[in-house]
Amino acid sequence: MTKYLLDTDICIFFIRGKYKVREKVYDIKSENCFVSEITLAELKYGAEKSDNYEKHAAEADYIARIFTVVPIIEHLDQFAKEKVRLQRAGTLIPDFDLLIGTTAVSGNFILVTNNEKHLSRIENIHIENWRKARFNGFLNGK
């Protein structure tokens, strides 16, 4: 079965009920969807700086409960190699994006993100953008 690594922006769309991301997760089953521990860290950071900490912290905890959280330790060699490659090419991307993206590559995930601009620079990455995707014959977008 195909495995999907959900980027932080997609998790936020899921939480907010935007772009039919929830429907897509339900269609493919949540057990086939994963999040990086970096995504979880970004969600917790967002909660911490929010004016509504309790709500956003609960949302981050919910994401951690319904999706398997993938540790980055096994993917750090891929991160280091890809960072050097991008640096030499003069096309670096933020480390958190690179950690999430290289986790997708080395873990054989399809990365689901709305951040195609940065993440498509990663070699051998497979990306889907569920914000732009078509489900049930209708173009998504709220």
Question: Model regions: which residues?
Answer:
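Generic structural signal for small/hydrophobic residues in well-ordered secondary structure
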Residues: D7-T8, L43, F79, A104, ...
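A general structural signal for well-ordered alpha-helical segments in protein cores
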Residues: L40, Y53-A57, L76-F79, D97
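Acidic, PIN/NYN-like endoribonuclease modules and their adjacent C-terminal/linker elements
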Residues: M1-T2, S106-K142
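Alpha-helix capping/helix-boundary segments
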Residues: I10-C11, T39, H75, K117-H118
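Short, well-structured N-terminal submotif of metal-dependent ribonuclease cores
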Residues: M1-V35, A47-A64, A133-N136
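Active-site neighborhoods of divalent-metal-dependent phosphate/nucleic-acid chemistry enzymes
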Residues: T68-N114
